[in-house]
Amino acid sequence: MTIRKSNPYLSLVNSYLMDSPQPSSMNYWWNVGSLLGLCLVMQMASGMFLAMHYSSSMELAFNSVEHMMRDVNAGWLMRYIHANGASFFFMCLYLHMGKALYYGSYKSPRVLVWSMGVMMFMLTMATAFMGYCLVYGQMSHWGATVITNLLSAMPFMGGDLVPLSIILSLYLLYISLKTFMKMIFNQSYMCPAKGWVKKVLDNTFCIKKYMHMYLSSRTSPXLYINTMSNMQHMKIMSTKSHTKDRDTSFLEKDIKNMDRNLLALMVGFMDGDGYIRMNKKSKDNMNYIYMSLIMNLNKNDLKLLQYFHQQLNMGKVYNMTPKKGNKLARWEMNKLDLFNKMEPLLEYHNMKFLTETRQKQYLLLKYIKHNKLVYYEDIINNNNYINEFIENNTLMDNFIKLDYFNNWLVGFTMAEGSFLIKKNKDICFQLKQKYNLELFNNMTLFFNTTRKLNINKNKYMQFNVSSKNDIQNMINFFSFSNNQPLLGNKLISYNKWLFTIKNSMRYKELKTPYMSWHQKEQ
């Protein structure tokens, strides 16, 4: 190993100057910034030596410059380096600005870096003008006159200000000569500070951007960074860019302020009507993991989905028309929503999906997130570990002891429950879903009913109650408890169900809630 890599001090320099990993999209235009730094160092060094022999006096200024050229050892070289260095400095400056304009560096989110550069450009021009006047010769005088005549560009009063400014120009130059000298020195030593501020902002932005790209590569197939060789060859495999980054994470206050009861209702609703889909998405000859949570409901439930979307600020809600069937309302959350919003929210409030299928889907999502699996083949390679993780974390019993079970059950009823009214005006309540025997046994215990579960040949579990005692328990649960109320079309069905009970002689002894005329109309 070479000394520049083995030596602890040289290796640091090597990592920044020689083997520094850079994006492959960079080109030679990025050298202009370092050339500006070189020009700045040259100007500061030559200017410091020139200032040692300069006299900031109106009578001696020009003579002191001639003294540098004739009497000072290598003074002519210092002056020409300083003069030509200024020209090269501005050439590099305009090339640097042109590169930034061409590549859109002034656009969001680099507005702050661009603004700092513009401020430095204005200060550099002011410094150059003051330095031009320090020689106090003919060119200095006419240069100051030209700048003074810029006042004529001012509307109305500009023409009157020019004669006054010309009369006072010599006096102003005399007064300001020493001031110019002080300001140039201040600007010269402030310029590196401003440059470092800009550099810090620029590097902070770049680090943030690279971190964003790296994290996105772990969660989204839209961006891919080849990290197999310690990011030596960084590749951005994306042709689509968005001017505004999506909000991909909850703030801590948003998680804490979330209504826990409403969240439990929404989890129950997703448990019933939602499903977490996982498949592979091929791009650039790579199979990425793609996950989403989807809920398809009747088009009449569009407002309900929009309400839930407004509360959680996750995914998108839209109407869709399948090839076969009626129009549907869909709520779809992508992988970023699930990883950065849904999972932290449920973990903070210590909530889980309770149906067996949804539990397995959610635990698979957690495993993929916490183990940073990106490629679909990773799931196959980790299949044994995934099965063990799901088996150890699946909740199989004691559902009714969960503090959020009541509100979860309201949401699950909105998805899978039915308030049935038969032709003979008999009523019953029904819950139906597949592969959840233990969950439905817990519901039987929760409602304290003696009815047995019906299990058909397709393994559909059906919880069905129709006795007066059981119906009263249902009314007590949905109307006389402190649970979240039913929402959407299920609330309309429940009100019709209650209205039938109120007007039936068979159920007249049952206690029912007061119904407004609006509820009766429903």
UniProtKB/Swiss-Prot annotation:
Topology feature Mitochondrial matrix, residues: 1-31, 106-110, 176-522
Domain of life, per lineage: Eukaryota
Annotated region (Maturase), positions in chain: 164-522
Topology feature Mitochondrial intermembrane, residues: 53-84, 132-154
Transmembrane segments: 32-52, 85-105, 111-131, 155-175
GO molecular function: endonuclease activity; RNA binding; ubiquinol-cytochrome-c reductase activity
Chain residue ranges for the region called Cytochrome b: 1-163
InterPro entries from the UniProt entry: Cyt_b/b6_N, Cytb/b6-like_sf, Cytochrome_b_N_euk/bac, Di-haem_cyt_TM, Homing_endonucl, LAGLIDADG_dom
Name of the molecule in the record: Cytochrome b mRNA maturase bI3
Gene: bI3
